[in-house]
Amino acid sequence: MDMFSWQLGLPSTLACLVFGYLLGSIPFGLILTRMAGLGDVRKIGSGNIGATNVLRTGNRKLAAATLLFDALKGTAAAAIASYWGVEAGIAAGFAAFLGHLFPVWLSFRGGKGVATYIGVLLGLMPVMVLLFAAIWLAMAKITRYSSLSALVATAAVPIALYAAGNGKVAGLFAVMTAIAWIKHRANIQRLLSGTESRIGEKG
């Protein structure tokens, strides 16, 4: 599959982008913590709306629910749009990822995108989720760094997709990986300085 060719018409592409963005911009971490009476998750820990920061409330079930819903919005966007072809799924999935990172409802301050990244991957190439999970779990067991595990796993995905002959999807995830790394720049700095929190530690 040619990574650079694009056959989907402009109106259809725009429709997929809008659909994906609106779905991806739903801030489940914020909604769930408020519904649970835990206040504004943006005012605790890292200030992030993702599952890792929700976990800092001490409510593991709520963090798991946030992870699930943040992933599923990416899956739904990509899978539903894919009914009209892989390019539609790519456009909607990418927009859902951006919607999570930059939700218009929260002044464009969202999460770091790993859960939604996984969700989009599930919607487009389900088998690759197994690769992501295997790498993440292996790295987490060895290093106990959640952020490093995610960074390594996201780096491996586009390489594996390209090697499998899925050029367009590989291109999508190469871009998403680059964005995810940028969103994790503070984590990268802490990893380099040895101050990043390990799994099971508060911080």
Curated annotation (Swiss-Prot):
Record keywords, A-Z: Cell inner membrane, Cell membrane, Lipid biosynthesis, Lipid metabolism, Membrane, Phospholipid biosynthesis, Phospholipid metabolism, Transferase, Transmembrane, Transmembrane helix
TM region(s), chain numbering: 13-33, 62-82, 88-108, 118-138, 159-179
One GO term (biological process): phospholipid biosynthetic process
Keyword Ion transport carried by entry: no
Cellular-component GO terms for this entry: plasma membrane
Reactions accelerated catalytically: an acyl phosphate + sn-glycerol 3-phosphate = a 1-acyl-sn-glycero-3-phosphate + phosphate
Localization per record: Cell inner membrane
Molecular-function GO term, any one: acyl-phosphate glycerol-3-phosphate acyltransferase activity
EC number: 2.3.1.275
Membrane topology qualifier: Multi-pass membrane protein
Top enzyme category: transferase
Pathway: Lipid metabolism; phospholipid metabolism
InterPro entries assigned to the protein according to its UniProt record, in alphabetical order: G3P_acylTferase_PlsY
PANTHER family: GLYCEROL-3-PHOSPHATE ACYLTRANSFERASE-RELATED, INNER MEMBRANE PROTEIN YGIH
Subunit structure, as described in the record: Probably interacts with PlsX.
Family: Belongs to the PlsY family.
Protein function: Catalyzes the transfer of an acyl group from acyl-phosphate (acyl-PO(4)) to glycerol-3-phosphate (G3P) to form lysophosphatidic acid (LPA). This enzyme utilizes acyl-phosphate as fatty acyl donor, but not acyl-CoA or acyl-ACP.
Name this polypeptide is given: Glycerol-3-phosphate acyltransferase
Protein source organism: Rhizobium meliloti (strain 1021)
